[in-house]
Amino acid sequence: MADALKDVPFKTVQVDALVAIKIATASGKAFPSLATGSLVGMEKNGVLEITNSFPYPEINTASADGQNDTAANLSAAAPRAKQNIAYGNEMIKFLREVNVDANNVGWYTSTSMGNFVNLNTIENQFYYQSQLNERTVALIYDVSRSSQGTLNLRAYRLSPSFVTAYKEGKFTTESLQKSSLRYQDILVELPVTVHNSHLLTSLLHQLPSEAPKEELSFPPNLAALQQDPNTPLPPLFPNYDALDLSIDPFLEKTCDLLLESIENHHTELNNYQYYQRQLAREQTKITAWQQKRKAENAARTASKQPLLPEDEWQRLFKLPAEPSRLETLLNSRQVEQYSRQVDGFAAGVTSKMFAVKSNLLPGE
């Protein structure tokens, strides 16, 4: 993690609680569609502080330029759409007029079950890092994971090596070997912290509870006061619902998505193997033609006739174009993302099973 962060202009991302609530609200309303928006804030002492956000307006599919674009594709590409860029610039102008942070520091998008490693995410973040502001970040909010009661908000940036390769637009086997680019080098994850102001923290501790309906006796001691059900609990009190022994339903769904990504990965590998077979057949034909032409030129030399050109094969034969390896890299990175989620789910389920093992298996 430290090696990946050494070339990043900032080391951590600090998100205001109000921004996290805005992102969660917009993502929940748009679910199962994607919700995207812009982030504003400032960088201070190696920390990217995100202090405000605003969602992008919904794109009408009837007024879109492309006839084949679906609503999902338009929503995913919203951060780099021309109308949304103009909308974001206008919003930042208004924010500057009211004297609040008005620096574009990135964008956010919602996802489900960690399914965000795709070409749209890469193109959006590349646009922000290369054209708007190099010091930008992408916040990924997982609606499905957050519905379990734990905020799932992650920050990512494109690595410098991947940005260089993406600018060149060459993702062939030779270019990947020269640059030593791996699927682990596509995205760099940054630690995220949620920040509350002191006033908000004080308010959380002073929130009144519901008034009792009958007169209560004065508690004789502190222990009785702590055991009183009418005593308000402190904020962020532990939630014991997480101790439920039922198998997490998201584990099964994540496994299905993992298998689907593996199938897509095998499809890309089969396409590349087909290209290699086609290339080998063409190279065999070219080699046979060159040997035949050399034999003809040897006979012409013996008979003192003019030689035939030996580079004519370039006009007669056409080598197949190598398919881009970018999709394979993205599929590999998505498989890794799902594997991490399965590992996290399995750890919680396994610990619960070991905790109740003595009650489930008699005699142990």
Swiss-Prot record:
Gene3D superfamilies: Cytidine Deaminase, domain 2 (3.40.140.10). It is found in: Cytoplasm. InterPro entries: eIF3h, eIF3h_C, JAMM/MPN+_dom, JAMM_MPN+_peptidase_M67A, MPN. GO terms for molecular function: metallopeptidase activity; translation initiation factor activity. It comes from the Eukaryota. PROSITE patterns: MPN. One of its GO terms (biological process) is formation of cytoplasmic translation initiation complex. Component of the eukaryotic translation initiation factor 3 (eIF-3) complex. Belongs to the eIF-3 subunit H family. This is Eukaryotic translation initiation factor 3 subunit H. It comes from Phaeosphaeria nodorum (strain SN15 / ATCC MYA-4574 / FGSC 10173) (Glume blotch fungus).
